[in-house]
Design a protein with these regions (language model features):
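N-terminal Rossmann-like or analogous alpha/beta NTP/dinucleotide-binding catalytic cores
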Residues: 2-157, 257-271, 315
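Short amphipathic alpha-helical segments and their helix-coil junctions
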Residues: 33-37, 69, 299, 339-347, ...
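Glycine- and acidic
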Residues: 36-43, 69-74, 243-249, 300-302, ...
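Residue-level signal for inorganic ion chemistry
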Residues: 57, 88, 132, 136, ...
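A generic secondary-structure signal for well-formed alpha-helical elements
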Residues: 92-99, 133-140, 152-155, 159-162, ...
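Active-site cores that bind ATP or allylic diphosphates and position pyrophosphate for catalysis
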Residues: 139-278, 283-293, 302, 460-471, ...
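Catalytic adenosine-cofactor/nucleotide-binding cores of aminoacyl-tRNA synthetases and other
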Residues: 269-450, 520-552
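Helix-rich, typically C-terminal accessory recognition domains appended to large enzymatic cores
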Residues: 479-488, 492-535, 539
Length: 552
């Protein structure tokens, strides 16, 4: 009996690997095209770090005319959560990052290199495991959990490196006949890789991001096929990325130490290894120290958080590119109106150390992104968000014609309004334009410099009775406020007041503030002329009257 007989005994009904090599031929892509993948496990919510990896992988593929695909690594089925795959697929859709190939729903996929769900590729992995066994490069291991625990305890007592290797690999040196006998006797087993490595030898590896890295060779006889017949991550990665013709594996740097093993697997399987690019994690400032964004501690670690907050997907992607390449910020300053797809992203320019997450910076980008949208776009995005997360806002936006006027205030100017950073800001920033919201929440009027109640009442009275005309253009409108200011003993120009502060009670800007506060209960709003044009004469008259009543 030889290795081939043993392989046939273990996997009698699987196809020869030549079948799969023919089924998944080289991709017909232009020279230099990069093939990348996002390969998450459906074991919980999608982490912002996962989205970061996916964005980088997709950007690199798109830039080179390559392919970006989604593969679901669901071989650890005990940890799989309900709707885990759906959550992954929807997260990519939400950020306009749908893959060129792979899973497009929990059960549907597109592309010619599937299945793209590892649990459906069991026979493929077994075919390649059979090949390794037939070559004497893998073997069945019959060690029980108790025996493995005993090995670990002995290693700990002797203070030597733990693991299944060398003299500790009890089943490595079983003869073919001994292994066959145990299998025929019904002893349970798994399949281990027979590592040709030695820990006292070094390998040199050039990571696309980290640069040159030295590692000890892998000498562990790792499990490649588990008792349930499914592969481990390491083995599935090698087989899948070979058959799917991945050219660049872009993943978290927590996998950097696995490179020696993965390169060894590729070599022993006779595959060409892909290039590896290990991304540093996104960090958080925690009391002066740096730590990884935590699923447990940080709500912003979950991709779902950004959707609930209503932070535009374009802003999140722009922010992630900002921390991915240090050249992005200068590019954006030079090209304020270009799509992020036009940025010349460089994988090898990514930071070797983890970037600090900056929510203030992200929200600032959100303001810029929203400021460039049309009123119609802002309305549509706000309504989509509100229907899922804010019933009151959704009801408010039912009058589309009025809402478009509200969102049109200071939009389309050379310097458009930048008060909305996320869709959850919308209610706060436009609520005062709606009577139900305004009267339901106004409880004080912060008038600022002019605080004398008689003066305030007179300003409001004179304005509506003598000066306001809804057909006035902006210059005429402001000239009339100046006239009102002068009539009331205030400076008609700010510079007049600054030159002779003793001659005036205040200036035209302070009079404008009285009107602003009376109409909006805010001291800071977008352009008052535009606000008043949208509110209209009847609303304005009523609000000024209510403000006067509030003075009593």
């Amino acid at each position: 009996m030889d290795y081939k007989d043993l392989a046939e005994l273990i996997f009698p009904d699987v196809k020869d690997i030549s079948y799969y090599e023919e089924k998944y031929p080289e991709r017909n892509l232009q020279e230099g095209a990069v093939v990348t993948r996002f390969a998450p496990s459906p074991t919980g919510f999608v982490h912002i770090g996962g989205l970061y990896q996916a964005l980088v992988a997709r950007t690199v593929a798109k830039k080179t005319g390559g392919v970006f695909f989604l593969r679901v690594e669901d071989t650890d089925q005990k940890r799989e959560v309900e709707n885990g795959v759906t959550g992954i697929v929807n997260s990519l859709k939400d950020f306009d990052m749908a893959p060129d190939e792979g899973m497009i729903s929990d059960t549907e996929e597109i592309g010619n290199y599937g299945p793209y769900k590892q649990s459906l590729r069991k026979e493929i992995y077994q075919a390649y495991a059979k090949y390794l066994i037939s070559q004497g490069k893998a073997y069945p291991c019959f060690c029980t959990q108790e025996e493995l625990d005993e090995i670990r305890q002995k290693q700990e007592s002797a203070k030597i490196r733990p693991g299944y290797y060398g003299v500790w690999a009890k089943c490595r040196n079983l003869t073919v006949e001994e292994s066959a006998e145990k299998i025929k006797n019904g002893e349970p087993y798994i399949i281990r890789f027979k590592s040709p490595g030695r820990e006292d030898r070094k390998i040199k590896h050039k990571d696309v991001i980290k640069g040159n890295v030295d590692f000890p060779e892998n000498d562990l006889d790792i499990v490649i096929i588990k008792a349930d017949g499914l592969p481990t991550y390491h083995f599935a990665h090698a087989v899948d990325d070979h058959l799917m013709h991945t050219t660049h594996v872009i993943r978290s740097d927590e996998w950097l130490s696995s490179v020696p093993l993965h390169l060894q697997l590729f070599h022993e399987l006779g595959f060409k290894a892909p290039k590896y690019a290990h991304i540093s994690p996104i960090m958080k400032n925690d009391n002066g120290g740096k730590r990884k964004l935590s699923k447990r501690k940080d709500p912003e670690a979950a991709v779902e958080y950004y959707k609930k907050e209503g932070i535009p997907s374009e802003a999140v992607k722009e922010y992630l590119l900002n921390i991915a390449n240090s050249t992005f910020e200068n590019w954006r300053k030079a090209n304020p109106d270009k799509s992020i797809d036009e940025f010349d992203f460089q994988l090898n320019k990514m930071s070797v150390s983890g970037a600090l997450f900056d929510m203030i910076k992200l929200l600032d980008i959100g303001k810029t992104v929203i400021s460039k949208m049309t009123a119609e776009e802002v309305y549509n995005y706000s309504l989509i968000w509100a229907k899922e997360y804010d019933e009151e806002l959704a009801k408010m936006l039912e009058d589309k014609e009025y809402a478009l006027k509200v969102f049109g205030i200071e939009r389309g100017n050379k310097k458009p309004r930048k008060d909305i950073s996320k869709w959850s800001d919308v209610m706060y920033n436009i609520g005062y334009m709606y009577d139900d919201e305004f009267y339901g929440k106004v409880n004080e009027y912060p008038y600022q410099v002019i605080s004398d109640k008689e003066d305030i009442a007179k300003i409001l009275d004179l304005y509506i009775s003598k000066y306001y005309n809804e057909s006035d253009d902006k210059q005429t409108w402001f000239d009339k406020i100046k006239e009102l200011a002068v009539e009331m003993g205030y400076a008609g120009e700010v510079k007049e007041f600054k030159a002779n502060p003793g001659m005036y009670k205040a200036h035209v800007g302070d009079v404008s503030t009285v009107l602003r506060v009376a109409l909006t209960a805010r001291t800071n709003t977008p352009d008052m002329y535009e606000i008043m044009q949208v509110l209209g004469k009847n609303r304005i008259a009523k609000r000024l009257e209510v403000a006067k009543e509030n003075l009593k």
